[in-house]
Design a protein with these regions (language model features):
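Extracytoplasmic/periplasmic, Sec-exported soluble proteins
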Residues: 55-59, 98-101, 109, 116-120, ...
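Extracytoplasmic substrate-binding proteins
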Residues: 45-48, 123-180
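Early extracytoplasmic/lumenal segment of secretory-pathway proteins
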Residues: 40-48, 95-107, 123
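A short, structured surface patch at a secondary-structure boundary
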Residues: 58-109, 113-118
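A short helix->loop->beta-strand "cap" motif at the edges of active sites that frequently abuts
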Residues: 54, 72, 131-134
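Hydrophobic core
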Residues: 12-16
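Extracytoplasmic/periplasmic mature domains of Sec-exported, cell-envelope-associated bacterial proteins
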Residues: 37-40, 44-47, 75-76, 113-116, ...
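Bacterial Sec-exported substrate-binding components of ABC uptake systems
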Residues: 2-8, 19-62, 161-180
């Protein structure tokens, strides 16, 4: 009887505490409602993508390399005077500078997903949502968060293996530099 109680107590503890730690995986297929993907963004909002996005706009140029790393395509992007831009995205329509997004141009592109920076674009979330546009706001601050966002981009574009590979490649590049 003591063994049974110990096993029962351990199972109960595992059940209770499994939801207490940080969520390493912020996305999941939404099987219960047949959605493509459910994402918890960096604002804590749950965003349900009913199907794989086909018309993505990035409001932060820093995310373009992540999107490019998984072979993702965009229909619009913010412009910036700093940073390298992937060649495939140089001729994509612009929706204004990162800090001055032209919402009319953005909405006119009819995106099914907007990838925004939490700090810069959180104020736009209600307007985008009222226009039935799915939007995630992210803000990776650490190396591990950057890798998590690479993996997220792979999931968004329906190629999770490319997101995992991009994160692994980043690890290899960092390792090569730090071992010198």
């Amino acid at each position: 009887m003591k063994i049974f109680r110990a096993v029962l107590a351990a199972a109960l503890c595992l059940t209770v505490f499994s939801g207490c730690g940080p969520n390493a995986e912020n996305t999941k297929p939404a099987n219960d409602d047949k959605a493509f993907l459910t994402i918890t963004d960096d604002t804590g909002r749950t965003v349900v993508l009913p199907e794989k996005p086909e018309r993505v706009v990035s409001l932060a140029t820093s995310y373009l390399n992540m999107i490019d790393a998984v072979g993702g395509k965009i229909v619009g992007r913010a412009s910036s005077k700093i940073g390298e831009m992937p060649e495939a995205m140089k001729n994509v329509p612009e929706v204004g500078f990162v800090y001055n997004i032209n919402m009319e141009s953005l909405i006119g592109l009819k995106p099914d997903l907007v990838i925004a920076n939490k700090n810069q674009h959180e104020k736009f979330l209600p307007l985008l949502e009222s226009n039935k546009i799915h939007v995630i706001a992210i803000n990776p601050k650490t190396y591990d968060e950057v890798k998590d966002k690479l993996i997220l981009m792979g999931k968004i574009y329906g190629v999770p293996e490319k997101g995992e590979a991009a994160a692994a490649k980043l690890d290899q590049q960092v390792k090569a530099v730090t071992e010198k």
